[in-house]
Amino acid sequence: MADNLEPLEPSLQNLVEQDSLKWIFVGGKGGVGKTTCSSSLAVQLSKVRESVLIISTDPAHNISDAFDQKFTKVPTKVNGFDNLFAMEIDPNAGLNELPEEYFDGENEALRQGRHARDDQRPCPGIDEAMSYAEVMKLVKGMNFSVVVFDTAPTGHTLRLIAFPQVVEKGLGKLLRLKMKVAPLLSQFVSMLGMADVNADTLSQKLDDMLRVITQVNEQFKNPDQTTFVCVCIAEFFSLYETERLVQELTKCGIDVHNIIVNQLLFLQKSHDSCSMCASRFKIQEKYLDQIADLYEDFHVTKLPLLEKEVRGPESIRSFSENLMKPFDPKAEPKE
């Protein structure tokens, strides 16, 4: 990069101001504070968007703990907010675990797809892939201005991100071969116990499935509509996972230009007698320098390690201000 490159704003202001964004994924290594960051981002978005949904795709489902409010698979208004909603789902469970009200009106096709997929459970990999596809299609059809995804740790998230390309490619090849393999498809249908479905019907189902996957894949790769925020801490393994995640996202064609470095120590004079604080500070400084070198064309937001946990809507509301402007350790803490 050029030596005179101006550093980018060290905040998430760019995301909050990008009105075209529809999906914002927040992810990283386990234990780095993804849920706190995604919840804080959702709070800031609720100030400028008509309606915001934060959705957990992490089986651990920590957003209920973060907001100190029980959430389910139905979008529920967050206490203290008029336009912020939250829900928790497990993509691996598929649409069978989602409530019937999701499948009214325009989503009737998804209802049919869910029941048709019940007969395909013996096919390894198909179930998980289509669960992801259907959940994402479902979210795409919801009437929220923007959706924030609180994702599972890196490995699980990479599968979520990569699935549209993999399935789209596989289904495309299968459909191109459908004329050659029609007899085999008929045998395949019989093996699945779908005697009333012929090869043409199955081909149509695959065609419909491909259409859904293609729509999701197009939105995934559209930087005007979708972006990814990586959360890490200033330690070796977290930085390693972040670089792996950034490379995979880039390979998949998914926009990523924001990194949050969480749980940072900002040394005060009162910490002079704390040798461990000083040691941790030096370690973090080393990795912050590496982050600055690796991601000079990223918005890098630095968040503090606090004395108290961030829990409850008011605590998150207060902490979320750190996403919009650099943290000032000299500022008076808000109660």
Curated annotation (Swiss-Prot):
Source taxon at top rank: Eukaryota
Active-site feature positions: 58
Binding site for ATP: 29-36, 235, 262
Gene Ontology MF term list: ATP binding; ATP hydrolysis activity; metal ion binding
GO biological process: tail-anchored membrane protein insertion into ER membrane
CDD domains membership: ArsA
GO annotations of cellular component type: GET complex
Cysteines engaged in disulfide bonds, as pairs: none
Keyword vocabulary terms for this entry: ATP-binding, Cytoplasm, Endoplasmic reticulum, Hydrolase, Metal-binding, Nucleotide-binding, Transport, Zinc
Pfam families: ArsA_ATPase
InterPro entries: Anion-transp_ATPase-like_dom (IPR025723), ATPase_ArsA/GET3 (IPR016300), ATPase_ArsA/GET3_euk (IPR027542), P-loop_NTPase (IPR027417)
Subcellular location as annotated: Cytoplasm; Endoplasmic reticulum
EC number, as in UniProt: 3.6.-.-
Enzyme class: hydrolase
Record: residues binding Zn(2+): 274, 277
Record HAMAP family: Asna1_Get3
Record-stated family: Belongs to the arsA ATPase family.
Function: ATPase required for the post-translational delivery of tail-anchored (TA) proteins to the endoplasmic reticulum. Recognizes and selectively binds the transmembrane domain of TA proteins in the cytosol. This complex then targets to the endoplasmic reticulum by membrane-bound receptors, where the tail-anchored protein is released for insertion. This process is regulated by ATP binding and hydrolysis. ATP binding drives the homodimer towards the closed dimer state, facilitating recognition of newly synthesized TA membrane proteins. ATP hydrolysis is required for insertion.
Quaternary assembly: Homodimer.
Protein name as it appears in the record: ATPase ASNA1 homolog
